[in-house]
Design a protein with these regions (language model features):
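RNA-binding accessory domains that recognize and position tRNA/RNA substrates
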Residues: 1-60, 72-74, 82, 169, ...
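Active-site-proximal beta-strand elements of phosphoester/diester hydrolases
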Residues: 23-28, 140-141, 199-203
Length: 231
């Protein structure tokens, strides 16, 4: 489900004032093209296979890092493990990082949390998500069967099989907090890293049913990258 080789999809991209856009390394774990379009409006995007190591990514001299959505169990070995390691290395290196869906789950694993199979997967375009910082409720589009455990409450609404990953250590070298939860079952829908320009969301901001819901999250990330480059 990943691309074959790294390529810049919009080389030489500039903003409305003719200034070069920041360069983003986007790890493709099964990325939707709508997400790439959203990113390409804000960044010069280096589209990288999920098997790309962080050392290989650094050769592109990125200003930021993105981990995409994708299918399957985030705890499986292989490409997902490489993507998780690259994500954790990007956080430790101080790059701004955003993760969506599977990218969110990989961030959870890198933070030492377990991922697990949900009793009832989140499917459809009407999943309510609460921003715990503002109290705002977003109506989101979701399509996933795994979740990241709550650091305080553990696995919420788990599948009867008990399928889950092992709990690990925090490879991010940064504390984190739960920022978003599902209003129906209270499962974790997003993390903010404390003291880092990094966050994740479990849902699809590029496909939200409301006229404005969630798509500004791409703008939030772009602002983080601008702040990073401004020092």
């Amino acid at each position: 489900v990943t691309c074959d080789e790294a390529v810049i999809i919009n080389p030489g991209a500039v903003d409305n004032e003719g200034k070069p856009l920041p360069r983003l390394a986007a790890i493709d774990c099964g990325v939707k093209h709508n997400i790439l379009r959203e990113l390409a409006q804000r960044f010069e995007v280096v589209w990288c296979p999920a098997t790309t190591t962080f050392d290989e990514i650094l050769k592109w001299e990125p200003d930021s890092f993105f981990a995409s959505n994708g299918p399957g169990d985030p705890a499986h070995s292989g490409a997902a493990t490489t993507a998780r390691d690259s994500l954790a290395a990007a956080v430790r290196a101080g790059l701004p990082v955003m993760g969506i869906c599977l990218g969110h789950q990989l961030m959870g694993l890198a933070a030492g949390l377990r991922t697990y199979k949900l009793r009832y997967g989140h499917r459809g375009a009407n999943q309510p998500v609460v921003d715990l910082e503002t109290g705002r409720v977003y109506i989101t589009s979701q399509n996933h069967g795994f979740a990241v455990e709550d650091p305080d409450k553990g696995m919420l609404a788990p599948h009867p099989s008990g399928a889950c990953s092992a709990r690990g250590s925090n490879e991010l070298e940064a504390p984190f907090k739960v920022r978003y939860v599902n209003a129906n079952d209270r499962t974790v829908e997003g993390l903010d890293l404390i003291g880092k320009r990094a966050f994740t969301i479990q849902y699809h901001p590029e496909a939200c049913p409301g006229p404005h819901d969630a798509s500004p999250l791409f703008d939030r990330f772009a602002s983080m990258v601008d702040d990073h480059l401004a020092g």
